[in-house]
Design a protein with these regions (language model features):
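Conserved ABC ATPase "signature" region
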Residues: 4-23, 306-324, 433-434
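A short, proline-enriched helix->beta-strand linker immediately N-terminal to the Walker B motif
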Residues: 47-51, 348-352
Length: 453
């Protein structure tokens, strides 16, 4: 039985597109990429020869290339094995690409069901219409995302401030012109397997001679498949990794150095990062007050603890949470509200640069619209420079002025956003755009669903 089980496991891994199956059977999950892990999960689901598979968010947080492969795999397995599949997802593009029928749920109840063609082109329920309108457009740039106002569980509207008298106004008044971030010849290699002799080490060139510049006040996108090096570049700029060689300058100050001089510390204060997962990036044991106050206390930007609380209260109001959130813990908030806390923490040091590393990939489309609109408002009001990392190409089109495409640690194209999406010059850029999930498989959406005017 053991040998038969091994043989079946090998066959299952081959059926889901995993090569070198005998060796892979002995590997651990952390040794697989995200796409390969998802293939293994699909193989596990097939092991019992089921008639029905339930796929719960099977492509969430996967880049467009891996997402397309997983969806194609699910479709082909359904045809070959005559399987039924229930896809649970917040990605309407996935539904458009794979499903025959769809049921839309809100507040625990099914509010609309029907053929995918019918639901996408002529939805009848207000919630379905709002969801479809909130999907970022990959074919057209709009000023704002259409938000679903009754979704996010208590988030207040964005509150504009009087920058002439507000402490955040100091950020705008102090914003210099010119290049905010300059990267020149940046390299980073990770050692995957250590060995006594250098020739026996296994290494990965995560960042390969990357050079780029981002202007003050610009929103700059970084896209690429998983493992392309985009998040590593962000972490190098933020000082979370140390580069092997190359230069990183923040408003002209070289920060690609190990020592922490006063100038480097001051430059780092100008830059803050919003991480991908709002569920793991916040300390579960800290109250929101202490989470947001941490950079204020670290950089000593308040004269007293009373002033710290006043600043935290003000920031929470500003991002739409309200002062009542101060004494709560992260587990008491929804995903979108937690990401607002992350944004509040990033603003607390009065930065001039925000690095947003996949800030909405863990959120559904309705909450995503709220967070992206908030980031747009903050950038416009405070004059922030943004480095926006995402594998979601429609989000990049809506959020960024220019885009760099990364592959295997190197930049293969930098262009204005509209130019990249309309006339990409590099074959890999065109490949990514071709893989982008589209909602208009059955024709263009009605004008009422085409996004905000």
């Amino acid at each position: 039985k053991g040998a038969a089980a091994i043989d079946k496991a090998v066959d299952l891994l081959r059926s889901v597109g995993i090569t070198e199956t005998e060796a892979r059977l002995k590997a651990y999950p952390h040794q697989f990429s995200g796409g390969m892990r998802q293939r293994v999960v699909i193989a596990l689901a097939l092991a019992g020869d089921p008639d029905l598979i339930i796929a719960d968010e099977p492509t969430t947080a996967l880049d467009v290339s891996i997402q397309a492969q997983i969806l194609d795999l699910i479709k082909s397995l359904c045809r070959e094995r005559q399987l039924g599949v229930i896809i649970v997802t917040h990605d309407i593009g996935v539904i458009a690409n794979i499903a025959d029928r769809v049921a839309v749920m809100y507040n625990g109840a099914v509010v609309e069901t029907g053929e995918v063609r019918q639901i996408l082109t002529a939805p009848t329920h207000e919630y379905t219409q709002s969801l479809i309108a909130a999907v970022p457009r990959g074919d057209l740039k709009v000023d704002r995302f259409t938000s679903v106002d009754y979704i996010e569980g208590g988030a207040q509207t964005y509150r504009r401030i009087d920058l002439d008298s507000h402490w955040l106004g100091e950020t705008v008044q102090a914003n210099p012109l010119g290049e905010a971030i300059t990267i020149d010849g940046l390299n980073k290699t990770f050692v995957l397997k250590k060995a006594l002799f250098k020739k026996n080490r296994v290494t990965l060139q995560a960042v390969d001679n990357v050079s780029l510049s981002i202007q003050a006040g610009e929103s700059f996108g970084l896209v690429g498949e998983s493992g392309s090096g985009k998040s590593t570049v962000a972490r190098l700029v933020a000082g979370l990794h140390q580069g092997d060689d190359g230069h990183i300058k923040i408003f002209g100050q070289n920060v690609a150095q190990q020592e922490r001089s006063n100038d480097v510390t001051a430059a780092r204060r100008n830059l803050q990062m919003i991480f991908q997962d709002p569920y793991s990036s916040l300390n579960a044991r800290m109250r929101v007050l202490d989470i947001v106050a941490e950079p204020i206390r670290f950089y000593k930007t308040a004269d007293s603890e009373k002033q710290v609380r006043q600043i935290v209260c003000d920031i929470l109001d500003h991002v739409g949470l309200g002062s009542g959130a101060m004494l709560k813990y992260p587990h008491e908030f929804s995903g979108g509200q937690r990401q607002r806390i992350s944004i509040a923490r990033a603003l607390a040091s009065r930065p001039k640069i925000l690095i947003c590393d996949e800030p909405t990939s863990a959120l559904d489309v309705s909450v995503q619209a709220h967070i992206l609109n908030l980031l747009k408002d903050l950038q416009a009001e405070l004059g922030l420079t943004m480095l926006f990392i995402s594998h979601d190409l429609p989000v990049i089109r809506q959020m960024c002025d220019r885009v760099a495409v990364m592959r295997h640690g190197a930049i293969c194209e930098i262009a204005q956003t509209e130019t990249l999406f309309d006339t990409p010059q590099h074959a890999y850029s065109q490949h990514l755009l071709d893989l982008m999930p589209r909602m208009d498989l059955f024709g263009s959406a009605p004008a009422s669903l085409a996004g905000p005017p």
